[in-house]
Curated annotation (Swiss-Prot):
The keyword Hydrolase does not apply. This is Ribosome biogenesis protein NSA1. Its main location: nucleus. GO terms for biological process: ribosomal large subunit biogenesis; rRNA processing. Disulfide bonds: none annotated. It is found in: Nucleus, Nucleolus. It comes from the Eukaryota. The gene is NSA1. The keyword tRNA processing does not apply.
Length: 430
Protein backbone atom coordinates (compact mmCIF):
# COMPACT_ATOMS: atom_id res chain seq x y z
CA UNK A 1 0.00 0.00 0.00
CA UNK A 2 1.23 3.49 -0.77
CA UNK A 3 0.11 6.71 0.92
CA UNK A 4 1.06 10.38 0.98
CA UNK A 5 0.63 12.45 4.15
CA UNK A 6 1.14 16.18 4.61
CA UNK A 7 3.61 17.30 7.26
CA UNK A 8 2.33 20.23 9.31
CA UNK A 9 5.67 20.52 11.09
CA UNK A 10 7.86 20.93 8.00
CA UNK A 11 5.56 21.66 5.05
CA UNK A 12 6.77 18.64 3.06
CA UNK A 13 4.96 15.45 2.02
CA UNK A 14 5.84 12.02 3.36
CA UNK A 15 5.48 8.92 1.21
CA UNK A 16 4.58 5.83 3.25
CA UNK A 17 4.88 2.37 1.71
CA UNK A 18 3.71 -0.52 3.87
CA UNK A 19 1.78 -3.77 3.89
CA UNK A 20 -1.03 -5.16 6.00
CA UNK A 21 0.16 -6.06 9.46
CA UNK A 22 2.62 -3.18 9.69
CA UNK A 23 2.81 -1.67 13.19
CA UNK A 24 5.68 0.61 14.19
CA UNK A 25 4.46 0.69 17.79
CA UNK A 26 5.55 -2.95 18.18
CA UNK A 27 9.19 -3.95 17.73
CA UNK A 28 8.40 -7.51 16.69
CA UNK A 29 5.70 -6.52 14.16
CA UNK A 30 6.14 -5.92 10.44
CA UNK A 31 7.79 -2.56 9.76
CA UNK A 32 7.04 -0.17 6.87
CA UNK A 33 8.94 -0.74 3.63
CA UNK A 34 9.65 2.98 3.30
CA UNK A 35 8.86 6.36 4.91
CA UNK A 36 10.48 9.24 3.00
CA UNK A 37 10.18 13.02 2.59
CA UNK A 38 9.25 14.55 -0.77
CA UNK A 39 7.81 17.81 -2.17
CA UNK A 40 10.38 19.96 -0.40
CA UNK A 41 9.85 22.77 -2.90
CA UNK A 42 8.99 25.64 -2.87
CA UNK A 43 10.88 26.58 0.36
CA UNK A 44 8.67 24.42 2.56
CA UNK A 45 8.16 25.22 6.23
CA UNK A 46 5.42 25.19 8.85
CA UNK A 47 4.45 28.72 7.78
CA UNK A 48 3.42 27.55 4.30
CA UNK A 49 2.36 24.02 5.24
CA UNK A 50 -0.09 22.00 3.18
CA UNK A 51 -3.73 22.05 4.32
CA UNK A 52 -5.31 19.93 1.56
CA UNK A 53 -3.96 17.58 -1.13
CA UNK A 54 -5.61 15.55 -3.90
CA UNK A 55 -4.58 13.02 -6.53
CA UNK A 56 -5.53 14.69 -9.82
CA UNK A 57 -6.29 12.07 -12.52
CA UNK A 58 -3.39 9.86 -11.35
CA UNK A 59 -1.07 12.46 -12.95
CA UNK A 60 -0.49 15.16 -10.36
CA UNK A 61 -0.37 15.59 -6.63
CA UNK A 62 -2.05 18.97 -6.13
CA UNK A 63 -1.55 20.70 -2.78
CA UNK A 64 -2.87 23.98 -1.42
CA UNK A 65 -0.68 25.71 1.16
CA UNK A 66 -1.22 28.40 3.75
CA UNK A 67 -0.58 31.73 2.04
CA UNK A 68 -2.31 30.74 -1.20
CA UNK A 69 0.35 28.68 -2.98
CA UNK A 70 -1.11 25.91 -5.14
CA UNK A 71 1.68 23.42 -5.83
CA UNK A 72 1.48 20.82 -8.61
CA UNK A 73 3.78 17.79 -8.36
CA UNK A 74 4.26 14.95 -10.81
CA UNK A 75 3.06 11.46 -9.87
CA UNK A 76 5.39 9.02 -11.60
CA UNK A 77 4.17 5.83 -13.27
CA UNK A 78 4.55 2.87 -10.91
CA UNK A 79 5.44 0.57 -13.81
CA UNK A 80 8.91 2.10 -13.93
CA UNK A 81 11.42 2.14 -11.11
CA UNK A 82 12.35 5.77 -10.45
CA UNK A 83 15.10 7.22 -8.29
CA UNK A 84 13.89 9.25 -5.32
CA UNK A 85 15.33 12.49 -6.69
CA UNK A 86 12.95 12.27 -9.67
CA UNK A 87 9.83 11.47 -7.65
CA UNK A 88 7.10 14.09 -7.13
CA UNK A 89 8.94 16.82 -9.03
CA UNK A 90 7.43 20.29 -8.72
CA UNK A 91 5.85 21.08 -12.11
CA UNK A 92 4.31 24.45 -11.29
CA UNK A 93 3.51 26.70 -8.35
CA UNK A 94 0.54 29.08 -8.59
CA UNK A 95 0.38 32.09 -6.27
CA UNK A 96 -3.30 32.75 -5.68
CA UNK A 97 -4.23 36.30 -4.73
CA UNK A 98 -5.36 35.97 -1.11
CA UNK A 99 -4.27 37.54 2.15
CA UNK A 100 -1.91 35.67 4.47
CA UNK A 101 -4.77 35.14 6.95
CA UNK A 102 -7.16 33.72 4.34
CA UNK A 103 -7.27 30.00 5.11
CA UNK A 104 -7.76 27.39 2.36
CA UNK A 105 -10.79 25.30 3.31
CA UNK A 106 -11.29 22.91 0.39
CA UNK A 107 -9.63 21.54 -2.73
CA UNK A 108 -11.21 19.18 -5.26
CA UNK A 109 -11.30 18.21 -8.93
CA UNK A 110 -13.84 19.66 -11.39
CA UNK A 111 -13.75 17.12 -14.21
CA UNK A 112 -15.95 18.97 -16.71
CA UNK A 113 -13.52 21.93 -16.62
CA UNK A 114 -10.40 19.73 -16.45
CA UNK A 115 -9.53 21.88 -13.47
CA UNK A 116 -9.32 22.03 -9.70
CA UNK A 117 -11.33 24.32 -7.43
CA UNK A 118 -9.78 25.94 -4.35
CA UNK A 119 -11.92 27.77 -1.79
CA UNK A 120 -10.79 30.12 0.98
CA UNK A 121 -12.45 31.27 4.19
CA UNK A 122 -13.04 34.72 2.67
CA UNK A 123 -15.44 33.19 0.12
CA UNK A 124 -12.94 33.40 -2.73
CA UNK A 125 -13.04 30.40 -5.08
CA UNK A 126 -10.36 29.83 -7.73
CA UNK A 127 -10.77 27.53 -10.73
CA UNK A 128 -7.38 26.42 -12.08
CA UNK A 129 -6.99 24.69 -15.46
CA UNK A 130 -3.60 23.05 -16.09
CA UNK A 131 -3.98 23.25 -19.91
CA UNK A 132 -2.42 19.89 -20.85
CA UNK A 133 0.67 20.31 -18.68
CA UNK A 134 1.43 23.81 -19.97
CA UNK A 135 0.29 25.56 -16.76
CA UNK A 136 -0.08 28.82 -18.68
CA UNK A 137 -3.70 29.71 -17.83
CA UNK A 138 -4.42 32.22 -15.09
CA UNK A 139 -6.67 31.02 -12.24
CA UNK A 140 -10.24 32.33 -12.48
CA UNK A 141 -11.62 33.98 -9.32
CA UNK A 142 -15.28 33.75 -8.28
CA UNK A 143 -16.50 35.51 -5.13
CA UNK A 144 -19.26 33.71 -3.24
CA UNK A 145 -22.23 35.89 -2.21
CA UNK A 146 -23.10 36.59 1.40
CA UNK A 147 -20.15 38.61 2.63
CA UNK A 148 -19.43 36.24 5.54
CA UNK A 149 -16.54 33.90 6.20
CA UNK A 150 -17.06 30.27 5.24
CA UNK A 151 -15.72 27.06 6.76
CA UNK A 152 -16.81 24.65 4.02
CA UNK A 153 -17.21 24.60 0.23
CA UNK A 154 -18.33 21.41 -1.51
CA UNK A 155 -19.44 20.36 -5.00
CA UNK A 156 -22.52 18.43 -6.06
CA UNK A 157 -21.07 15.37 -7.86
CA UNK A 158 -24.27 14.75 -9.83
CA UNK A 159 -25.28 18.25 -10.97
CA UNK A 160 -22.67 20.32 -12.77
CA UNK A 161 -22.16 23.87 -11.57
CA UNK A 162 -23.87 23.34 -8.20
CA UNK A 163 -21.92 23.88 -4.97
CA UNK A 164 -22.70 24.28 -1.29
CA UNK A 165 -21.04 26.42 1.37
CA UNK A 166 -21.49 27.64 4.93
CA UNK A 167 -19.69 28.55 8.13
CA UNK A 168 -20.03 30.18 11.54
CA UNK A 169 -23.42 31.92 11.68
CA UNK A 170 -23.56 31.35 7.94
CA UNK A 171 -26.14 28.64 7.22
CA UNK A 172 -25.95 26.45 4.13
CA UNK A 173 -26.36 28.06 0.74
CA UNK A 174 -26.52 26.19 -2.54
CA UNK A 175 -25.09 28.23 -5.38
CA UNK A 176 -24.87 27.83 -9.15
CA UNK A 177 -21.49 29.01 -10.44
CA UNK A 178 -21.70 27.99 -14.13
CA UNK A 179 -24.00 26.33 -16.66
CA UNK A 180 -24.13 22.53 -16.83
CA UNK A 181 -23.08 22.40 -20.51
CA UNK A 182 -19.81 24.23 -19.90
CA UNK A 183 -16.47 22.73 -21.08
CA UNK A 184 -12.79 23.36 -20.48
CA UNK A 185 -12.70 25.37 -23.73
CA UNK A 186 -13.88 28.43 -21.80
CA UNK A 187 -10.31 28.87 -20.53
CA UNK A 188 -9.30 29.67 -24.13
CA UNK A 189 -11.72 32.61 -24.36
CA UNK A 190 -10.70 36.24 -23.75
CA UNK A 191 -13.10 37.04 -20.91
CA UNK A 192 -13.18 33.64 -19.26
CA UNK A 193 -14.56 35.08 -16.01
CA UNK A 194 -17.82 35.93 -17.81
CA UNK A 195 -18.62 32.20 -17.93
CA UNK A 196 -18.94 32.14 -14.13
CA UNK A 197 -21.65 33.61 -11.92
CA UNK A 198 -22.85 33.38 -8.33
CA UNK A 199 -26.55 32.56 -8.29
CA UNK A 200 -27.94 31.38 -4.95
CA UNK A 201 -30.56 28.67 -5.61
CA UNK A 202 -31.23 27.61 -2.00
CA UNK A 203 -30.70 29.05 1.47
CA UNK A 204 -31.19 26.81 4.50
CA UNK A 205 -33.26 27.87 7.48
CA UNK A 206 -32.10 27.25 11.03
CA UNK A 207 -33.73 24.51 13.10
CA UNK A 208 -36.47 25.51 15.53
CA UNK A 209 -35.60 27.01 18.91
CA UNK A 210 -34.61 24.60 21.67
CA UNK A 211 -36.76 23.52 24.64
CA UNK A 212 -35.97 26.81 26.40
CA UNK A 213 -37.09 28.69 23.29
CA UNK A 214 -33.51 29.80 22.69
CA UNK A 215 -32.06 30.16 19.22
CA UNK A 216 -29.79 27.27 18.18
CA UNK A 217 -26.38 28.57 16.99
CA UNK A 218 -25.27 27.86 13.40
CA UNK A 219 -21.78 26.69 12.44
CA UNK A 220 -21.43 24.52 9.35
CA UNK A 221 -18.17 22.55 9.16
CA UNK A 222 -18.85 20.01 6.38
CA UNK A 223 -21.29 19.50 3.49
CA UNK A 224 -21.67 16.33 1.41
CA UNK A 225 -24.12 15.96 -1.47
CA UNK A 226 -25.71 12.58 -2.07
CA UNK A 227 -24.90 11.02 -5.44
CA UNK A 228 -28.59 10.29 -6.08
CA UNK A 229 -30.31 13.65 -6.42
CA UNK A 230 -34.06 14.35 -6.81
CA UNK A 231 -35.28 15.57 -10.20
CA UNK A 232 -35.92 18.97 -8.68
CA UNK A 233 -34.03 20.33 -5.72
CA UNK A 234 -31.04 18.92 -3.85
CA UNK A 235 -30.30 16.37 -1.16
CA UNK A 236 -27.27 16.73 1.10
CA UNK A 237 -25.92 16.21 4.61
CA UNK A 238 -24.09 18.66 6.87
CA UNK A 239 -21.91 18.46 9.97
CA UNK A 240 -21.59 21.21 12.55
CA UNK A 241 -19.21 22.65 15.10
CA UNK A 242 -21.66 21.54 17.78
CA UNK A 243 -21.59 17.82 16.99
CA UNK A 244 -24.72 17.59 14.82
CA UNK A 245 -25.27 15.91 11.48
CA UNK A 246 -28.31 17.05 9.49
CA UNK A 247 -29.96 15.67 6.37
CA UNK A 248 -31.60 18.10 3.92
CA UNK A 249 -33.98 17.56 1.04
CA UNK A 250 -34.82 20.92 -0.48
CA UNK A 251 -38.13 19.55 -1.80
CA UNK A 252 -39.28 19.30 1.83
CA UNK A 253 -38.48 22.84 2.88
CA UNK A 254 -35.52 24.88 4.02
CA UNK A 255 -35.05 23.13 7.36
CA UNK A 256 -33.33 19.74 7.70
CA UNK A 257 -35.54 16.65 7.48
CA UNK A 258 -33.29 14.91 10.01
CA UNK A 259 -31.27 16.46 12.85
CA UNK A 260 -29.01 14.27 15.00
CA UNK A 261 -26.51 15.09 17.73
CA UNK A 262 -23.76 12.46 17.46
CA UNK A 263 -21.00 13.97 19.62
CA UNK A 264 -20.24 16.91 21.91
CA UNK A 265 -17.18 18.25 20.07
CA UNK A 266 -16.77 20.03 16.70
CA UNK A 267 -17.02 17.64 13.75
CA UNK A 268 -13.92 17.98 11.55
CA UNK A 269 -14.53 15.42 8.79
CA UNK A 270 -17.61 13.86 7.22
CA UNK A 271 -17.24 10.95 4.78
CA UNK A 272 -19.66 8.47 3.24
CA UNK A 273 -18.74 4.97 4.43
CA UNK A 274 -20.40 2.88 1.71
CA UNK A 275 -21.54 3.07 -1.91
CA UNK A 276 -25.20 3.30 -0.89
CA UNK A 277 -24.32 6.44 1.12
CA UNK A 278 -26.45 5.13 3.98
CA UNK A 279 -23.57 5.36 6.45
CA UNK A 280 -21.15 8.14 7.35
CA UNK A 281 -17.87 8.34 9.21
CA UNK A 282 -17.17 11.42 11.31
CA UNK A 283 -14.13 12.59 13.24
CA UNK A 284 -14.17 15.29 15.91
CA UNK A 285 -11.68 17.69 17.47
CA UNK A 286 -10.99 15.36 20.40
CA UNK A 287 -10.22 11.74 19.45
CA UNK A 288 -13.48 10.35 18.10
CA UNK A 289 -13.79 8.50 14.79
CA UNK A 290 -17.23 6.90 14.52
CA UNK A 291 -19.50 5.29 11.93
CA UNK A 292 -23.22 6.15 12.00
CA UNK A 293 -26.19 4.92 10.01
CA UNK A 294 -28.40 7.48 8.29
CA UNK A 295 -31.33 5.08 7.93
CA UNK A 296 -31.23 3.20 11.25
CA UNK A 297 -32.40 5.61 13.93
CA UNK A 298 -32.64 5.12 17.68
CA UNK A 299 -35.75 7.18 18.41
CA UNK A 300 -35.17 7.38 22.17
CA UNK A 301 -31.37 7.29 22.31
CA UNK A 302 -30.91 10.87 23.54
CA UNK A 303 -32.61 11.75 26.80
CA UNK A 304 -32.09 14.93 28.83
CA UNK A 305 -34.07 16.35 31.73
CA UNK A 306 -35.14 19.97 31.97
CA UNK A 307 -36.66 21.51 35.08
CA UNK A 308 -39.04 23.53 32.93
CA UNK A 309 -39.76 21.09 30.10
CA UNK A 310 -39.30 17.71 31.79
CA UNK A 311 -37.72 14.80 29.92
CA UNK A 312 -36.57 15.68 26.41
CA UNK A 313 -36.15 12.68 24.12
CA UNK A 314 -34.48 13.02 20.71
CA UNK A 315 -33.69 10.51 17.96
CA UNK A 316 -30.04 9.68 17.20
CA UNK A 317 -28.48 8.17 14.07
CA UNK A 318 -27.52 4.66 15.17
CA UNK A 319 -23.88 4.29 16.16
CA UNK A 320 -22.44 1.38 14.14
CA UNK A 321 -19.06 1.46 15.85
CA UNK A 322 -16.00 3.48 16.75
CA UNK A 323 -12.49 3.30 15.35
CA UNK A 324 -10.22 3.42 18.39
CA UNK A 325 -6.49 3.88 19.03
CA UNK A 326 -5.93 7.54 18.11
CA UNK A 327 -5.18 10.43 20.47
CA UNK A 328 -6.18 13.93 19.42
CA UNK A 329 -8.00 15.30 16.40
CA UNK A 330 -8.07 13.48 13.05
CA UNK A 331 -7.98 15.75 9.98
CA UNK A 332 -7.07 13.40 7.12
CA UNK A 333 -9.67 10.74 6.26
CA UNK A 334 -9.97 8.60 3.11
CA UNK A 335 -12.30 5.66 2.43
CA UNK A 336 -11.83 3.04 -0.29
CA UNK A 337 -11.40 -0.68 -1.03
CA UNK A 338 -13.08 -1.55 2.26
CA UNK A 339 -10.48 0.43 4.22
CA UNK A 340 -10.42 3.64 6.26
CA UNK A 341 -7.18 5.65 6.18
CA UNK A 342 -6.62 8.35 8.83
CA UNK A 343 -3.99 10.82 10.00
CA UNK A 344 -3.98 13.59 12.59
CA UNK A 345 -2.35 15.24 15.56
CA UNK A 346 -0.91 12.10 17.16
CA UNK A 347 1.54 11.66 14.23
CA UNK A 348 0.34 8.22 13.15
CA UNK A 349 -0.99 7.02 9.81
CA UNK A 350 -3.59 4.33 10.48
CA UNK A 351 -5.42 1.97 8.15
CA UNK A 352 -8.59 0.33 9.48
CA UNK A 353 -10.77 -2.42 8.08
CA UNK A 354 -14.16 -0.75 7.55
CA UNK A 355 -16.21 -3.81 8.44
CA UNK A 356 -14.37 -5.09 11.52
CA UNK A 357 -12.86 -1.70 12.53
CA UNK A 358 -9.59 -3.51 13.29
CA UNK A 359 -6.25 -1.83 12.54
CA UNK A 360 -4.74 -3.15 9.31
CA UNK A 361 -1.60 -0.98 9.41
CA UNK A 362 -0.17 1.62 11.77
CA UNK A 363 2.86 3.76 10.91
CA UNK A 364 4.47 6.50 13.00
CA UNK A 365 5.28 9.34 10.59
CA UNK A 366 6.69 11.77 13.19
CA UNK A 367 4.65 14.77 12.04
CA UNK A 368 1.17 16.19 12.55
CA UNK A 369 -1.02 15.36 9.55
CA UNK A 370 -3.66 17.55 7.89
CA UNK A 371 -4.28 15.58 4.71
CA UNK A 372 -3.96 12.02 3.42
CA UNK A 373 -3.86 10.76 -0.18
CA UNK A 374 -4.05 7.08 -1.14
CA UNK A 375 -1.97 6.15 -4.18
CA UNK A 376 -2.31 2.36 -4.01
CA UNK A 377 -4.21 -0.13 -1.84
CA UNK A 378 -2.34 -3.14 -3.25
CA UNK A 379 0.29 -4.97 -1.22
CA UNK A 380 3.86 -3.90 -1.96
CA UNK A 381 6.86 -6.15 -2.49
CA UNK A 382 9.31 -5.79 0.39
CA UNK A 383 13.05 -5.25 -0.03
CA UNK A 384 13.70 -8.80 1.20
CA UNK A 385 11.38 -10.21 -1.47
CA UNK A 386 13.10 -8.11 -4.14
CA UNK A 387 16.54 -9.33 -3.03
CA UNK A 388 15.22 -12.90 -3.02
CA UNK A 389 13.90 -12.50 -6.57
CA UNK A 390 17.28 -11.16 -7.73
CA UNK A 391 19.12 -14.10 -6.16
CA UNK A 392 16.68 -16.53 -7.78
CA UNK A 393 17.22 -14.83 -11.13
CA UNK A 394 21.01 -15.11 -10.77
CA UNK A 395 20.74 -18.84 -10.01
CA UNK A 396 18.42 -19.32 -12.99
CA UNK A 397 20.84 -17.51 -15.33
CA UNK A 398 23.74 -19.57 -14.00
CA UNK A 399 21.81 -22.81 -14.63
CA UNK A 400 20.91 -21.71 -18.17
CA UNK A 401 24.56 -21.12 -19.06
CA UNK A 402 25.28 -24.80 -18.34
CA UNK A 403 22.51 -26.01 -20.71
CA UNK A 404 22.93 -26.76 -24.43
CA UNK A 405 21.82 -23.96 -26.76
CA UNK A 406 18.50 -25.61 -27.77
CA UNK A 407 17.51 -26.35 -24.15
CA UNK A 408 18.53 -22.81 -23.16
CA UNK A 409 16.21 -21.31 -25.79
CA UNK A 410 13.35 -23.54 -24.62
CA UNK A 411 14.01 -22.45 -21.03
CA UNK A 412 13.95 -18.77 -22.03
CA UNK A 413 10.65 -19.30 -23.85
CA UNK A 414 9.17 -21.04 -20.79
CA UNK A 415 10.28 -18.15 -18.53
CA UNK A 416 8.67 -15.65 -20.89
CA UNK A 417 5.32 -17.46 -20.79
CA UNK A 418 5.50 -17.73 -16.99
CA UNK A 419 6.06 -13.97 -16.71
CA UNK A 420 3.14 -13.23 -19.04
CA UNK A 421 0.83 -15.52 -17.04
CA UNK A 422 1.96 -13.86 -13.80
CA UNK A 423 1.16 -10.39 -15.16
CA UNK A 424 -2.23 -11.59 -16.40
CA UNK A 425 -3.08 -12.95 -12.94
CA UNK A 426 -2.06 -9.65 -11.31
CA UNK A 427 -4.24 -7.69 -13.73
CA UNK A 428 -7.24 -9.88 -12.95
CA UNK A 429 -6.72 -9.41 -9.22
CA UNK A 430 -6.59 -5.64 -9.56
Amino acid sequence: MKFLVSSDDTGVVKEVICNRGTDTSKQDATQPISVKNFCTEPNCSRKNRIIHMINYQEKYLVAIRIGGELSVYEIADDEYEIEDEYKYNLLHNYKLEVSSSDKPISLFTVDILEAVAVAFSSGKVFFVNFNDDKFDKEPVLVQLPGGKEIAEFSKNPSVEGIFGYGGEENDVRIVKLYESDITSEIFDTENVENNFKSEVVFTAKNVKNDHLDLRVPVWITKIRFFTEQPEKGYKFITATHYGQIRVYDTNHGRRPVRDFTVCQKPILTLTFANEEESEVIISDSHNLIAKHSLIQVDDKASKTHSASAGDIIKPVAKLLGRFVDQFGATYGVEVGEGLLVTGGLDRYLRVFDLASREIVAKVYVGVEVSSVVVLDYEEEESQEEIVGDVELLKKSEKRKRTLPVVEREESDEEDLWNQLEEKDIKRKKS
